[in-house]
């Protein structure tokens, strides 16, 4: 295990630029990243976004923070937000978000994420910035989450 990388990268989730910076002393940085991925010392969440294996993380990953990082601009909404607020009894595994971009789905080693397209004119109304120990993220208000749920269920 390359403990040095864990000590040099403070956050549990990091991007390609941070990795390149930490590994700049290696002759072939891309090959080194490939070896770290193959050995399981780092995990690719999405192209350009990485995390450490669970035993090296300082805290559990927050799916809402990841959802905002994986595809943007986006905010967590619909089923996942309703579950977060305790408005539906079901446990929701798929992190649902709204975006002004194209609809997308990502299946990653740390969870599944779905992004539904939202009209740009209505996008920013009713979004709240949530602060957690794992980072901050954008989430729909309770009312907006209900509205987005109605839109995505059409």
Explain the meaning of each model-derived region.
Residues 1-73, 109, 124:
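Short beta-edge/loop segments at beta->alpha junctions of small alpha/beta modules
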Residues 53-154:
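Nucleic-acid-binding surface
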């Amino acid at each position: 295990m390359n403990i040095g990388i864990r000590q040099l990268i403070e956050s549990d989730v990091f991007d390609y630029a941070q990795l390149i910076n930490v590994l700049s002393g290696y002759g072939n940085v891309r090959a080194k990243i490939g070896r770290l991925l193959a050995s399981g010392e780092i995990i690719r969440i999405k192209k350009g976004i990485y995390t450490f294996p669970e035993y090296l993380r300082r805290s559990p990953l927050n799916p809402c923070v990841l959802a905002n990082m994986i595809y943007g601009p986006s905010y967590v909404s619909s089923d996942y937000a309703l579950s977060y607020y305790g408005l539906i009894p079901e446990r929701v595994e798929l992190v649902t978000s709204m975006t002004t971009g194209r609809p997308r789905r990502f299946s990653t080693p740390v969870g599944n994420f779905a992004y539904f397209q939202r009209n740009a004119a209505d996008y920013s109304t009713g979004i709240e910035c949530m602060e957690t120990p794992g980072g901050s993220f954008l989430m729909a208000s309770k009312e907006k989450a209900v509205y987005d749920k109605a839109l995505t269920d059409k």
